[in-house]
Amino acid sequence: LNKEYREKFSLLNYYTYYKDKWRIGMEEKKIVVAGHVSLDITPKFNMRTKVSSIGSVIKAGKLVNVGQVAIAPGGCVTNTGLALKKFGVDVKLIAKVGNDEFAEILYEKYRKQGVEPNFIVSEEDNTSYTIVLALNGCDRAFLHDSAANDSFCEKDIDYEVVRNSDYFHFGYPTLMKEFFREDKDELRKMFKKVKNFGLITSLDVTTIDPDSEQADIDWNQRLSEVLPYVDFFVPSVEELCFMLDKNKYYEIQNRASDDVCMHLSLSEDIVPMAEKVITLGCKGVLIKCGAAGMYLMTSDSVRMKELDGKISIEEWSNKRIFQNSYTPDRILSGTGAGDTSIAAFIYGICKGMTPEDTLRIAAGTGASCITEYDTLSGLLPISILKNKIQNGWKEQNFIHK
């Protein structure tokens, strides 16, 4: 009798587990991507060889011959949102622009991707733009005007659209004045409202200029206020290190003569930061480590239980996974690689994939993105990406354990 009971109980667990996985994966999820948008202007550098740093090319008094310029939508809303659209996901975009020519270019570019933008239009602000300096062999640099992003605030969010969705992703509050000002509480208020609707939430940030007012903010304190309402925090290792420990950030910068991500220790640099973030309240942290790959850490099943019915708690609890990057077919530009990899990460969550498979398609998406100058042209359909991985796509082992 005991054996028969155990067998029935085991079959019941098996049925329940796979029934839930089927339901999570087959339901069509509605995703909202909100936050920062800009027009990216990227000149093509005709370099014969790889360079170690941008400073070795761009110097005072020197003329640098460049090629055709690429003009494309940029920012989190574009890069993550349109990548999700390309993956076949139902996605709504929330952002703020000016009433100007740059906005018209953005609208035209979005429509070509099959998206009708319904952005908030400011008559007082211009549309944000970014000049992207992307040279083969070194990390990118940016010249950026936040513009209308600085007046975007929590009240600009269309909460009716959010309420009728399943997943909410917000990007780049570190570049949006109303969201990073210390006398404001916009970021926490927004995520608390969204979380009360029962959505899965994620937060992305971007590089902080050490000479900006954002650099003086106590980001440990700010994150401790916001992350309890964030399920997945998805920063890069440089961004996170600057926020948590500036001294450590400068120490790593000094240690690395070129790409910081190539000089990281998993045990000494990445894992301690991930552990710190988990204590600040989020359920999981995905740290993007550039050419090295990405690291996922999730909390225990007690905290993850809040996402029951939305993801597999058994599969996603207590995870510690470093996913190596994949060898790209070629390297033209790193623009949007992190954002599009996050789009694949969100896709995997919403489709009921395991964390291991989710990280594989996220890393594969990043490696595909950098094969073109713009963000979207190099992206592969998820089915083709999976086949490429299953057929032995070579991983790159750059991380120091």
What is the meaning of each model-derived region?
Residues E182-K189, A215-R222:
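Charged helix-capping and loop-helix junction motifs
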Residues K21-I94, E101-K112, I313-S317, N324, ...:
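Glycine-rich phosphate/adenosyl-contacting loop at the front of the ribokinase-like
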Residues K109-D125:
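A glycine-rich helix N-cap at a beta->alpha junction
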Residues S122, V132-E178:
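Conserved phosphate-binding/catalytic loop of the ribokinase/pfkB sugar-kinase fold
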Residues Q113-E116, D216-F242, E315:
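Structural recognition of alpha->loop->beta junctions
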Residues L175-D185, E213, L244, I252:
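Glycine/threonine-rich flexible loop motifs
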Residues L1-G25:
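Short, Lys/Arg-enriched N-terminal segments with co-localized hydrophobic residues
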Residues R23-G35, K192-N196, E225, L244-K401:
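Conserved phosphate-binding/catalytic region of the ribokinase-like
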